[in-house]
């Protein structure tokens, strides 16, 4: 089973580890694995070199029995030590660089230097507050109250041919992507749907899980509260 097939089947929880913010990333990975996470995303910040990323991924894979997937915040965050990469295009960025510019350069790097990486083309759509991701990518986030706009982006992503769509409220967002927005996007986008940002309780995770996403992502909970992370993972699976 390849990575895309794995993501497509059922509903899963992934833990996002940002090695630039989490020095003790192995401890966080172990907490997440003990909590029952189904996969680990690595990346996010801008201050990670290619050699650092390779070491982090190899270290995590040495203790993980789940897929380790790149979530690159820059072109330097590529390594074929990972199981795959979310090849992100920030659809609601106001800067063409984040829609297609970085992707052109990244595609050449992957083809030449990391051909073993499984590439998952991913429409990245920033919602609500947007957090650091929205600020850095110069995005115009979709308001929480406008599922119709999110649906329009989802339809466009499907027609263009993206394999996955990631609804991102942003790290540390005051609230997550609303369940009604997830529901609307699920109806419009038949492929892999990922939702992340602002999910801090099992109740919120369950309400989102019931709307049919394939993957729900949480970040710092593994470090801040391993017990709460376990509750969230169970809520997602038992929805």
Curated annotation (Swiss-Prot):
Subcellular location: Cytoplasm
GO BP: glycerophospholipid biosynthetic process
Binding-site positions, Mg(2+): 18, 45
Catalytic activity, as annotated: sn-glycerol 1-phosphate + (2E,6E,10E)-geranylgeranyl diphosphate = sn-3-O-(geranylgeranyl)glycerol 1-phosphate + diphosphate
Annotated residues for binding of sn-glycerol 1-phosphate: 166-172, 197-198, 219-220
Keywords, sorted A to Z: Cytoplasm, Lipid biosynthesis, Lipid metabolism, Magnesium, Metal-binding, Phospholipid biosynthesis, Phospholipid metabolism, Transferase
Molecular function terms, GO-annotated: magnesium ion binding; phosphoglycerol geranylgeranyltransferase activity
Pathway: Membrane lipid metabolism; glycerophospholipid metabolism
Enzyme class: transferase
Positions of disulphide bridges: none
EC code: 2.5.1.41
GO CC, one annotated term: cytoplasm
Pfam family, one: PcrB
Names of required cofactors: Mg(2+)
Family membership noted in the UniProt record: Belongs to the GGGP/HepGP synthase family. Group II subfamily.
Function: Prenyltransferase that catalyzes the transfer of the geranylgeranyl moiety of geranylgeranyl diphosphate (GGPP) to the C3 hydroxyl of sn-glycerol-1-phosphate (G1P). This reaction is the first ether-bond-formation step in the biosynthesis of archaeal membrane lipids.
HAMAP family from the UniProt entry: GGGP_HepGP_synthase
NCBIfam families cross-referenced by the UniProt entry: GGGP, GGGP-family, PRK04169.1-2
PANTHER family xrefs: HEPTAPRENYLGLYCERYL PHOSPHATE SYNTHASE, PTHR40029
The protein, known as: Geranylgeranylglyceryl phosphate synthase
Lineage: Archaea, Thermoproteota, Thermoprotei, Thermoproteales, Thermoproteaceae
